[in-house]
From Swiss-Prot:
It comes from Solanum lycopersicum. It is found in: Plastid, Chloroplast thylakoid membrane. This is Plastocyanin, chloroplastic. The lineage of its organism: Eukaryota, Viridiplantae, Streptophyta, Embryophyta, Tracheophyta. Belongs to the plastocyanin family. Keywords: Chloroplast, Copper, Electron transport, Membrane, Metal-binding, Plastid, Thylakoid, Transit peptide, Transport.
């Protein structure tokens, strides 16, 4: 919340002003201006840098603490137009969110191979439908894997071109 305060200002009174007066006429100011204002905090460069340092340190600590809860981002397609998951082979902790992001605008999806996931995991609950596609650059699909083991996943339209990846859940 911001507050605004005004200062008391005394306006001087001018007497003896006449229109068309000669240059030798004098202007009389019977009162002087007085301003009452709240004291202004004075910052030194040293204090400012100290404050900036504290903000930077606090931001870094927040980022480190939040990084454990952040999602791992996997790009669907390379900047060079390659049909690949980037990274293609990675590890996450159980319960960590994985976000797959369409990088290049080609239609992609993420399907987990039911024959290459841990026993007891239902591939249909963690996969996109083979008919569903992330068509535009920036579109995402997120999944959280809680069972430890190795999971193989692929992009259905580009599996034949080698767009396959692996994640190990620790």
């Amino acid at each position: 919340m911001a507050t605004v305060t005004s200062a008391a200002v005394a306006i001087p009174s001018f007497t003896g002003l006449k229109a068309g007066a000669s240059s030798s006429s004098r202007v009389s100011t019977g009162a002087s201006a007085k301003v009452a204002a709240a004291p202004v905090a004075r910052l030194t460069v040293k204090a400012s840098l100290k404050d900036v340092g504290a903000v930077v340190a606090a931001t870094a600590v927040s980022a480190m603490l939040a990084s454990n809860a952040m999602a791992l981002e996997v790009l669907l397609g390379g900047d060079d137009g390659s049909l690949a998951f980037i990274p293609g082979n990675f590890s996450v902790s159980a319960g960590e969110k994985i976000t797959f992001k369409n990088n290049a605008g080609f239609p992609h999806n993420v399907v987990f191979d039911e024959d290459e996931i841990p026993a007891g995991v239902d591939a249909s609950k963690i996969s996109m439908s083979e008919e569903d596609l992330l068509n535009a650059a920036g579109e995402t699909y997120s999944v959280t894997l809680s069972e430890k083991g190795t999971y193989t996943f692929y992009c259905a339209p580009h599996q034949g071109a080698g767009m396959v990846g692996k994640v190990t859940v620790n």
